[in-house]
Amino acid sequence: VDGVLLIAEHGDYPRNERGQKLYPRYEFFQQITSVFRTTGKTAPVFCDKHLSYDWNRARQMYDTSQELGFAFMAGSSLPVTSRVPAIDIPLGASVEEAMCMASAGDDGGDIHALEAMQAMVERRSGGESGVKWLQDYRGDAFWEAHAAGAWSADLFAACLCRSHQLAPARPGFNHHYPTIDEMKSLAAKPWA
């Protein structure tokens, strides 16, 4: 085994008082490190998204990685998965604006969207120069920012047209580009 990708989702898990899903990352990590202890062999572990919803569990996971001496990383696994459509920005390209649309929530879906976009944008001229600024818009503030031109309406439309999850806003109308009011009914909790 050259490495372990820990993904603990796609199940029906309860939420805590902060609204976080109680994904069993810690429990999966304990099973992984149990194998490491039993075999005496380790491999780098990449934890999809964050380590845990609980600081003490996250700290224990980190401490265990230090104790057993294996590389331990966390973030989105999406930058290394296949893309639909299969696209990469050419190395050294000039990039003026980038946008990513995602249908997932803010307990992991946000990091997936941001890191998937960053993985593609870092191919731009200047390379891995980081993120200069990030603004979050939620609910009505999202639609207000859209109306105010906080991002390119053409880029927004291009992203929306590539969606594999866009349902017709009106029954019986397939491949119909929704109006702003229809978008609001399709996206109950938008954020950008």
Regions found by a protein language model. Name each.
Residues V1-P44, R57-Q60, Q66-L68, E122-W133, ...:
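N-terminal glycine-/serine-/threonine-rich beta1-alpha1-beta2 phosphate-ribose binding loop
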